[in-house]
């Protein structure tokens, strides 16, 4: 689920000020938004726009291309959902908006947010927004498109498929959003993204949103964006407010015992544990389950249905621990997660930011704990340098950071 209630805004000074025309708008009521869109915003639980929403929504509604970057858990999905919905004409049941996400789970969550915020624009109909992801029948996609889908949210592979089959008509598209744009423009997705662009109207508005925006990705955007408005945070700001970061020096063979000790030391509402391989995820989940912890695990080799079931169990609290690979490092929001454990440090620096954003979202207090072997020391230093942050050794009284 997305945000319920107040978002703690980022420090205003964390945004670059060299982009002309970017003025923070502190209230949704002061933005040029349709009355029924405002009804949806407030009924969804938004109270005050976050920093990225204050800066990105109005430029989005003007129709120009936009590149927006902000930390995980600060309302990026809300920002582009509101901007997108304001740009659509609900009098016409044709496809007008396309949102591309790197994973099925993120696509489904995004579609839920758009559906709820756009409820009153669509006069109560939930069918205006549909998902197009792998693991579902193509015939079901045809049915959705024929029933008047106005916003499509999908993964690149499936969107390419239904577009090439002629099922997804793109001539009326007004807006394309690339969510988690750094991942979407990586080598794994780049070819599919370029395939999709071949089918899009020349004058389509393109919006990129992500927590990280490396220089090579910004360079790529020059190929398909026209004079975009840029809202970029300063590199030294790319750490998470409300997330206290620690490390534990531990060798590989002692990691499991250290993990067990942690769970015996403090009472944890819900936690996410990241490991780098599917095999280790399965092994960790098995070890924790045998110690009477309620544990779920998720990785890319599970079917779509299995992954949805796991996330449902974790969201409703039936499971208190989720062990996973980087599959869910982006975009999954579970309200009661207050601790993230990197059993293995991530293999790429950008994923560190996405991982630790699972705890303490939307201003809630959270803790990130990194298990660091002797071989990992240099990696940890690189992470600290990249984000201009300091990761402290876990203190004896660390339970205080969880509100105990």
Curated annotation (Swiss-Prot):
Q: What class of enzyme is it?
A: hydrolase
Please tell me whether the keyword NAD is annotated for this protein: no
Q: Where is this motif: Q motif?
A: 26-54
Q: Which reaction does it catalyse?
A: ATP + H2O = ADP + phosphate + H(+)
Keywords for this protein: ATP-binding, Helicase, Hydrolase, Initiation factor, Nucleotide-binding, Protein biosynthesis, RNA-binding
Mind telling me which SMART domains this protein's record contains?
DEXDc, HELICc
ATP-binding keyword on record: yes
Q: Domain (Helicase ATP-binding): give its ranges.
A: 57-231
Annotated GO molecular function terms are:
ATP binding; ATP hydrolysis activity; ATP-dependent activity, acting on RNA; mRNA binding; RNA helicase activity; translation initiation factor activity
GO biological process terms held by the UniProt record:
cytoplasmic translational initiation
Helicase C-terminal domain segment(s): 242-402
Q: Where does ATP bind?
A: 70-77
Q: Which domain of life is it from?
A: Eukaryota
One Gene Ontology CC term in the entry: cytosol
Entries under Pfam families matching the protein: DEAD, Helicase_C
Q: What is its EC number?
A: 3.6.4.13
Where is the segment annotated Disordered? Answer: 1-28
Task: List the ranges annotated as motif DEAD box.
Answer: 179-182
User: Could you describe the subunit structure of this protein?
Assistant: eIF4F is a multi-subunit complex, the composition of which varies with external and internal environmental conditions. It is composed of at least EIF4A, EIF4E and EIF4G.
Q: What does this protein do?
A: ATP-dependent RNA helicase which is a subunit of the eIF4F complex involved in cap recognition and is required for mRNA binding to ribosome. In the current model of translation initiation, eIF4A unwinds RNA secondary structures in the 5'-UTR of mRNAs which is necessary to allow efficient binding of the small ribosomal subunit, and subsequent scanning for the initiator codon.
Annotated family: Belongs to the DEAD box helicase family. eIF4A subfamily.
Q: State what protein this is by name.
A: Probable eukaryotic initiation factor 4A
Task: Name the species this protein comes from.
Answer: Trypanosoma brucei brucei (strain 927/4 GUTat10.1)
């Amino acid at each position: 689920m997305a945000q319920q209630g107040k978002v703690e805004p980022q420090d205003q000074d964390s945004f670059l000020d060299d982009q002309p025309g970017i003025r923070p708008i502190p209230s949704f009521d002061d933005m040029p938004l349709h009355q029924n869109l405002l009804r949806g915003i407030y009924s969804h639980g938004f109270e005050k726009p976050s920093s990225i929403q204050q800066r990105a929504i109005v430029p989005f509604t003007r129709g120009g291309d936009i590149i927006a970057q902000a930390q995980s858990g600060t309302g990026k999905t809300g920002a582009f959902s509101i901007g997108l919905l304001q740009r659509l004409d609900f009098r016409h049941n044709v496809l007008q908006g396309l949102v591309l996400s790197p994973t099925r789970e993120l696509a489904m969550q995004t579609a839920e947010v758009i559906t709820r915020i756009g409820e009153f624009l669509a006069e109560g109909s939930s069918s205006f927004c549909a998902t197009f992801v792998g693991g579902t029948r193509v015939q079901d996609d045809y049915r959705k498109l024929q029933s008047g889908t106005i916003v499509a949210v999908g993964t690149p592979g499936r969107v390419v498929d239904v577009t090439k089959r002629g099922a997804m008509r793109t001539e009326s598209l007004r807006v394309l959003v690339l969510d988690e744009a750094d991942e979407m423009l990586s080598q794994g997705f780049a070819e599919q993204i370029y395939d999709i662009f071949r089918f899009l109207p020349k004058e389509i508005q393109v919006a990129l949103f992500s927590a990280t925006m490396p220089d090579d990705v910004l360079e790529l955007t020059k190929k398909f964006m026209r004079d975009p408005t840029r809202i970029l945070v300063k590199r030294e700001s790319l750490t998470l407010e409300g997330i206290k970061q620690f490390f534990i020096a531990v060798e590989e063979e002692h990691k499991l015992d250290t993990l067990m000790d942690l769970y015996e030391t403090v009472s944890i509402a819900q936690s996410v544990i990241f490991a780098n391989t599917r095999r280790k995820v399965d092994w960790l989940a098995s070890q924790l389950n045998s110690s009477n912890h309620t544990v779920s695990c998720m990785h890319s080799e599970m079917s779509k249905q299995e992954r949805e079931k796991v996330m449902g169990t974790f969201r409703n609290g039936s499971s208190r621990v989720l062990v996973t690979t980087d599959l869910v490092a982006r975009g999954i929001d579970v309200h009661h997660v207050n601790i993230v454990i990197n059993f293995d440090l991530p293999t790429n620096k950008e994923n560190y930011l996405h991982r630790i954003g699972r705890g303490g979202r939307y201003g809630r207090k959270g803790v990130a704990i990194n298990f660091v072997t002797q071989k990992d020391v240099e990696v940890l230093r690189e992470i600290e340098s990249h984000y201009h942050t300091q990761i402290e050794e876990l203190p004896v009284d660390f339970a205080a950071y969880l509100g105990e």
